[in-house]
Swiss-Prot record:
This is Ribosomal RNA small subunit methyltransferase H. One of its GO terms (cellular component) is cytoplasm. It catalyses: cytidine(1402) in 16S rRNA + S-adenosyl-L-methionine = N(4)-methylcytidine(1402) in 16S rRNA + S-adenosyl-L-homocysteine + H(+). Its main location: cytoplasm. Keywords: Cytoplasm, Methyltransferase, rRNA processing, S-adenosyl-L-methionine, Transferase. Specifically methylates the N4 position of cytidine in position 1402 (C1402) of 16S rRNA. It is found in: Cytoplasm. Its EC number is 2.1.1.199. The keyword Kinase does not apply. Belongs to the methyltransferase superfamily. RsmH family. It comes from Streptococcus uberis (strain ATCC BAA-854 / 0140J). S-adenosyl-L-methionine binds at residues 35-37, 55, 84, 105, 112.
Length: 316
């Protein structure tokens, strides 16, 4: 891993081991990032196995080309620069119609957070950006300066779950009427000014939830995850598995709901047994989410909110 792309992988062994890797299987890392999961997964494959890696960030792919060079040279890995919401079409274009397993590590990678100019963090001043794909049109600047008041309130409530969403949206509206809000530091100060003093004394940065909400809006993170996970589940082979790491309640709720829908069936009253064609296609490998160990939490502070859920395809 290059110094420019340093990333500590969360729930490394649990996420990959839960896929029950077949050495000659076809696998997908839907969120390449720092390539930690990819590296460990590739170590379990033989030369007949293959891993397809998705990332919107060209820097992540460039880093992985170097970090995974030995596997690249053996023709065991293919990199795809695309949003994982296009999973099925991108894989189909490469002749892949069925996969043995897939993993997702949702959220922002550490290098994106740490790279000041990407504008993800409220901890350092930078232009408002927050794009995971630097070629995308919509930026945080556009959301903050151009979205109507009601749209700001909606995304702050929906994606940030911040009870002061209206007050924050009003402060933003007032500030941008004077001059555009251009940097993360400016926005963080406006958010702080909208919250009562007792809120500012609470643990955690007062801007965290609003920054999360804007980031989710800019990248349509939940919409993309919903589409991609559903596509992945249709592409899994029999006994294929899907591992999903989430970092906040919205992602976890979405994953839990998708897995529940795929692993349960509503039986109409009066039917004594469930016909085979109505049986659920998936079963939960994890009834409750797997959490990082105490050792991992001590080594990596960013692992604190991580949850891993896994499901297995039991019927086609």
């Amino acid at each position: 891993m290059t110094k420019e792309f340093h990333h500590i992988t969360v729930l490394l062994h649990e996420t990959v081991d839960m896929l029950d890797i077949k050495p000659d299987g076809i696998y997908v890392d839907a969120t390449l990032g720092g390539a930690g999961h990819s590296s460990y997964l590739l170590s379990k494959l033989n030369d007949n196995g293959h891993l397809y890696c998705f990332d919107q960030d060209q820097k992540a792919i460039d880093n992985a080309q170097v970090f995974l060079k030995s596997y690249v040279d053996r023709g065991m890995v293919t990199f795809i620069k695309a949003n994982f919401r296009h999973l099925k079409s991108e894989l189909n274009a490469l002749g892949v119609t069925e996969i043995d397993g897939i993993l997702y590590d949702l959220g922002v990678s550490s290098p994106q957070l740490d790279e000041r100019e990407r504008g993800f963090s409220y901890k350092q001043d930078a232009p408002l950006d927050m794009r995971m794909d630097s070629d995308a049109a919509l930026t945080a600047y556009h959301v903050v300066n151009d979205y109507p008041f009601q749209d700001l309130v909606r995304i702050f409530f929906k994606y940030g779950e911040d009870k002061f969403s209206k007050q924050i949206a009003r402060k933003i509206e007032q500030a941008r009427a004077i001059k555009p809000i251009e940097t993360t530091a400016e926005l963080a100060e406006i958010i702080k000014s909208a919250k009562p003093a007792k809120e500012l004394k609470k643990k955690g940065h007062p801007a965290k939830q609003i920054f999360q909400a804007i980031r989710i809006e800019v990248n349509d993170e939940l919409g993309a995850a919903d589409e991609s996970i559903q596509e992945a589940m249709t592409m899994l082979a029999l006994n294929g598995r899907i591992s999903v790491i989430t970092f906040h309640s919205l992602e976890d709720r979405l994953t839990k709901q998708l897995f529940k829908e795929a692993s349960t069936v509503d039986v109409p009253k009066g039917i004594p047994f469930i016909p085979e064609d109505m049986q659920p296609k998936f079963e939960l490998v994890t009834r409750k989410p797997i959490l990082p160990s105490q050792e991992e939490l001590l080594a990596n502070n960013r692992a604190h909110s991580a949850k891993l859920r896994v499901a297995r395809k039991v019927r086609m």
